[in-house]
UniProtKB/Swiss-Prot annotation:
Gene3D superfamilies on file: 3.30.70.260, P-loop containing nucleotide triphosphate hydrolases (3.40.50.300)
UniProt binding sites for ATP: G75, R76, S77, G78, A79, G80, K81, S82
Reaction catalysis annotation: L-methionine(out) + ATP + H2O = L-methionine(in) + ADP + phosphate + H(+); D-methionine(out) + ATP + H2O = D-methionine(in) + ADP + phosphate + H(+)
Taxonomic placement: Bacteria, Pseudomonadati, Pseudomonadota, Betaproteobacteria, Burkholderiales
Residues annotated as domain ABC transporter: 39-278
Name of the protein in question: Methionine import ATP-binding protein MetN 2
Keywords: Amino-acid transport, ATP-binding, Cell inner membrane, Cell membrane, Membrane, Nucleotide-binding, Translocase, Transport
Class in the EC hierarchy, top level: translocase
PROSITE patterns, A to Z: ABC_TRANSPORTER_1 (PS00211), ABC_TRANSPORTER_2 (PS50893), METN (PS51264)
GO cellular component: plasma membrane
Gene Ontology molecular function terms on file: ABC-type D-methionine transporter activity; ATP binding; ATP hydrolysis activity
Pfam family, one: ABC_tran
Amino acid sequence: MTQLFDTLGFIEASAVRAGAGADAVAHEEAVTPVGGAAVSLEQVGKVFATPRGQAAALRDVTLDVRRGEVFGIIGRSGAGKSTLLRLLNGLERPSSGRVRVQGVDVGALDEDGLVALRRRTGMVFQHFNLLSAKTVFENVALPLKIAGVPKAERVRKVEALLELVGLAAKRDAYPASLSGGQKQRVGIARALVHDPEVLLCDEATSALDPETTQSILALLADINRRLGLTIVLITHEMEVIRAVCDTVAVIEQGEVVETGPVWRVFGDPRHGATRALLSTLQHDLPAELAARVRPLPEQAALPDGAQIVLDVRYTGESGGEPDVGALAAALGGSVRFLHGGIESIQGHAQGRLVIAATPRADDAGPSTARGGAVAALLERARRHANHAEVLGYV
């Protein structure tokens, strides 16, 4: 219910009030942005009053979103993601710090200023919140109708948007006949009616099945490319970040704990919260393989014919594809691939290879965990990968 009120309130607040005329235009010119990032947060804090006292939802958040990029904000439930997004569209005011959208200080705006801002800031909500008694066309046209836009212009604009989101054939359908993905496409079209410069997405795919999620993310990416639109989306799913975002910020207990290009954050996560979120994408060894891997002996030599199991990881820092042949040649002897794979994120190849390698006979010392051939093998692996560690032997 709260999201429904937010949706309707946002639609009404983003409409130019009928009869405002030249005053509204003049005020919009007064808040026209000049240069800089599309979205900027400077040491932003947000405190709410609770029966138990003050509760900090956000603490000292500093972020910059470049114009034209897709910026993802991810965190667990209650981390502060939705509060942050509500600050960007003026549904909440910061308790401290400064929020700028298109160069405009959101916290300093009066109601007229917020109207002008929201015309340039579209909003896609988690729940579709469509009016059941209105058709697809009427739902998308509603903000324009409230704004007093002439009918002919409304028709032109809405039909173009329905074509953009792939719903031209559903123009006269009612929400009850639509799938979840189609309903969200209506929500996206509605968010674009005022030609916004920034699109805010609040868990826009969390109510959808995986296949539909991918289609909506593909639509957002297409809109970003076609319109040059800056998109800020919040999610709790790393798959969403990987699929569509250029940059990601990880938020934990109201603080931004890590930020960077998606390929870097995925390939080399530096904070525990990031690693925890990524754990759902990083599969453990298959049970059958894990049962075969034995821990290295502390003192005794390895059994004859044993191979060292290495976990080799590529973070994408080199930019090119890993030279697996060079790795195998450096390790020497018999090298077997046991598990893993390589994928490309933003043109950076990264992934994990679990391999079994035979220590070379010319490496000095016994093949134990304390040095000798195992240490030499590990050192050679590290020369050809970003990270490598010994898991045991088979």
